[in-house]
Amino acid sequence: MSSAVEPPPPPPPESAPSKPSAAGAGGSSSGNKGGPEGGAAPAAPCAAGSGPADTEMEEVFDHGSPGKQKEIQEPDPTYEEKMQTDRANRFEYLLKQTELFAHFIQPAAQKTPTSPLKMKPGRPRVKKDEKQNLLSVGDYRHRRTEQEEDEELLTESSKATNVCTRFEDSPSYVKWGKLRDYQVRGLNWLISLYENGINGILADEMGLGKTLQTISLLGYMKHYRNIPGPHMVLVPKSTLHNWMSEFKKWVPTLRSVCLIGDKEQRAAFVRDVLLPGEWDVCVTSYEMLIKEKSVFKKFNWRYLVIDEAHRIKNEKSKLSEIVREFKTTNRLLLTGTPLQNNLHELWSLLNFLLPDVFNSADDFDSWFDTNNCLGDQKLVERLHMVLRPFLLRRIKADVEKSLPPKKEVKIYVGLSKMQREWYTRILMKDIDILNSAGKMDKMRLLNILMQLRKCCNHPYLFDGAEPGPPYTTDMHLVTNSGKMVVLDKLLPKLKEQGSRVLIFSQMTRVLDILEDYCMWRNYEYCRLDGQTPHDERQDSINAYNEPNSTKFVFMLSTRAGGLGINLATADVVILYDSDWNPQVDLQAMDRAHRIGQTKTVRVFRFITDNTVEERIVERAEMKLRLDSIVIQQGRLVDQNLNKIGKDEMLQMIRHGATHVFASKESEITDEDIDGILERGAKKTAEMNEKLSKMGESSLRNFTMDTESSVYNFEGEDYREKQKIAFTEWIEPPKRERKANYAVDAYFREALRVSEPKAPKAPRPPKQPNVQDFQFFPPRLFELLEKEILYYRKTIGYKVPRSPDLPNAAQAQKEEQLKIDEAEPLNDEELEEKEKLLTQGFTNWNKRDFNQFIKANEKWGRDDIENIAREVEGKTPEEVIEYSAVFWERCNELQDIEKIMAQIERGEARIQRRISIKKALDTKIGRYKAPFHQLRISYGTNKGKNYTEEEDRFLICMLHKLGFDKENVYDELRQCIRNSPQFRFDWFLKSRTAMELQRRCNTLITLIERENMELEEKEKAEKKKRGPKPSTQKRKMDGAPDGRGRKKKLKL
């Protein structure tokens, strides 16, 4: 067994048989002093009231009889009596465990508020008449008098002893299999908590069966204590199905129900299932609890079990406040992660469990001296003593000997050429930060870190990085990412070995890329992330775990797939990227490394070499090592260690920057996968050896005291370099200059939009300011160009050679020849230039031009009347004149492609509005009373939220108000609120204008499809009928004669 905090439960009687036994009245309270581990432990007698007596077995309601509701109408005396008995036994038991509890119990008794408004939600406080007893019990400085001792002995002898139960084998009510030895010990520990009126935390490492031990406890309550419920189990939404299946599998006699669904489904469940009371255990999620809190408050709960208990570590959170308001006899917290954040969060959990003991956070913090706790061994021991009665934590390596080991290998990969370009671009954007010249804002640093991590995963996570459109799924998906290259080599080897793989990533868009990759390589896969619906989530897990499953890969987001999921059929875990918190990655590994696993689990962690990822993983490894050194039993870590300072983030960003800047070539090699794995295993072993030699002080500072340090990189000690960082700076790579091509030489100089070249070619000091959108005659630009060339000749300007042009020497020669042969403007040309300067739209500025373009986009190029109204300060005649010239000479504009695309997008929207209006007119026109008769052809897109009556109203009212009217959806929302038809339809009345718009867009799409189908059907029927038959007049009339008259037939 681990050295984890495992408290000694009350010992069984001496005559306890191998099966569960009961010590009745007159049984001795002393005996073998064996705890759950069989070691010596102080005996705790089974005192009166430590469990409900026979008279206390009566339920608040007749739990088994149908038709009776469990709704609480008034306080139940049995319930209150049980609470008072538990309180007295709790104090007595805790004081026998350690005298430290006198510190908490005594002030708690003194400080109990009398006003209900001042009481914190949770368990009832100690009454006034109990204060004196607690004070005398807590005073250990004076010996008791003989009289006091006699009175205590008399009181003890007058108490009726209660039944104590201890299992030495798996209970008979557990049907599907048998509990393992350590699970039986865990069940006994939970039972001892109940018998002593103590609430606790079951903190076994993930995969050790906390779910089964909890279900066994509730089964014990029903079969041995005659308390079937009501119990509540509060779990993450992702594990609801797993909990329900575990109840049915292990203890089928427990009637479990699950509260989940939308508003209507929940209301029906409460009415038909919850209130009638034909159940023992209600399993629900955190979200459902918050939504249905008013219903749950109506019950006197026996056991409240909270899975993933860290959700209530903040006592001010909404969930934490709500669960404290429930009436509960016993509370149990489950967590697979260490209590690692800070002492205040630990107090929050203890306050939830025992608010009458731990009622003051300030007193708790001062007692353990939060700031110095980890450095004071006595305080650490004191913390262990306080935790011992409440916390049970065991580790796989100690209790589950049959579980194969887990082997982790760090695989270091290089950057591809595209990744280096994007990595460089990100660093260059914030080069001032790298060189400590800019403002070091924490959010800015976090953003840089996030962007660099995206680049390490795959450059296609950035918009515009992937070549296309059209987008293709082929080898470029692999070659442009170093991690994908290694993955493409690793997966075929694993498939050949018969392994099955879990791939975890922090980013769901990485899963999108992996999904395309698996389809391209024909790997069968499942996927699970935070957006996966609950039903699909369970279907995927079942499909992957079923016998002889053909699914090879299961890709999961680390946060969504890291809790409450059993994927022990996989034996390989690939961490595509690493989390800041090492516990999150450990939870991901435990999806496969858990009870039921028969193979050695191999974990491959991908790390991009010489990047920020190296520092993130190193920091996580050090933090994990520190967790194992400091307070191993309670797993408490100094709260400051979780915070990343700005200096540390800067060092992470700077790491490898010079290496990335030094080259643009890919670092990906053609090394085979066996060589990559061998090299990774070697580096992993070296890192583990360094960590094992590190002292606690080094771990706290995330530094190494050994000669070989992670800060010693390529022969340089970066700790020493950090001291002189202000004198050094990272030299950015040389900037690549873009060649600036233009049709006209003048616009190359006068209308430059790209980066100016150095040195910039000189221009005459007094040049007229002309813009291309003013549409001056082309002759003017020829004269201005001639003037510029002559000016450069007069100052002796020499054209520099541009290194970016392929024929730089020839271009330089031609440009210089123009300057050398330039002549000044003569009088006629000067006069012509002045005349031409008056022939453009000189009174149109950039603002007028932009308004003109936006008006064309809004109304379309042909609606000149509305366009003229949009351009401020211009008469309709001026706009009409400008519009005519614009459409005639628009190709002279420098950004004409961008401008035309903007206008055409607007015109497309106009056409779309027209087609939608036509579709609505056609649909509404088919009915005389559309508000009552209109039917919508949903097909398979009905949806679950909106009814047909609601959809009918939305379409008809949208048509009535006018689809293209401004703010039409705000008016539609107001119409819904004013309509008596929906006065009780809270769902529809609570929709926002944006939600109504989305629903209307869906309905319009359905209507357009319906109209199209009807038109095609009508065309087909017309074609089937053929042309209309000709008239039969020829039978009665004769053919026309030569003058065009018809002859009559002679009869």
Curated annotation (Swiss-Prot):
It catalyses: ATP + H2O = ADP + phosphate + H(+). Residues 486-637 form the Helicase C-terminal domain. Ubiquitously expressed. The modification Phosphothreonine is found at residues 55, 112. The modification N6-acetyllysine is found at residue 439. Its EC number is 3.6.4.-. Component of the ACF-5 ISWI chromatin-remodeling complex (also called the ACF/WCRF complex) at least composed of SMARCA5/SNF2H and BAZ1A/ACF1, which regulates the spacing of histone octamers on the DNA template to facilitate access to DNA. Within the complex interacts with BAZ1A/ACF1; the interaction is direct and is required to slide nucleosomes from end to center positions on a DNA template in an ATP-dependent manner. SUPFAM superfamilies: HAND domain of the nucleosome remodeling ATPase ISWI, Homeodomain-like, P-loop containing nucleoside triphosphate hydrolases. ATP binds at residues 204-211. ATPase that possesses intrinsic ATP-dependent nucleosome-remodeling activity. Catalytic subunit of ISWI chromatin-remodeling complexes, which form ordered nucleosome arrays on chromatin and facilitate access to DNA during DNA-templated processes such as DNA replication, transcription, and repair; this may require intact histone H4 tails. Within the ISWI chromatin-remodeling complexes, slides edge- and center-positioned histone octamers away from their original location on the DNA template. It comes from Mus musculus (Mouse). Residues 1-81, 1014-1051 are annotated as: Disordered. Residues 191-356 form the Helicase ATP-binding domain. It comes from the Eukaryota. It is found in: Nucleus; Chromosome. Belongs to the SNF2/RAD54 helicase family. ISWI subfamily. This is SWI/SNF-related matrix-associated actin-dependent regulator of chromatin subfamily A member 5. Residues 39-53 have a biased composition (Low complexity). GO terms for biological process: antiviral innate immune response; cellular response to leukemia inhibitory factor; chromatin organization; chromatin remodeling; DNA damage response; DNA methylation-dependent constitutive heterochromatin formation; DNA repair; DNA-templated transcription initiation. The modification Phosphoserine is found at residues 65, 115, 136, 170, 754. GO terms for molecular function: ATP binding; ATP hydrolysis activity; ATP-dependent chromatin remodeler activity; DNA binding; helicase activity; histone binding; histone octamer slider activity; nucleosome binding. GO terms for cellular component: ACF complex; B-WICH complex; CERF complex; CHRAC; chromatin silencing complex; condensed chromosome; fibrillar center; ISWI-type complex. The keyword Ligase does not apply. Residues 1022-1033 have a biased composition (Basic residues). CDD domains: DEXHc_SMARCA5, SANT, SF2_C_SNF. Residues 68-81, 1034-1043 have a biased composition (Basic and acidic residues). Residues 1-15 have a biased composition (Pro residues).
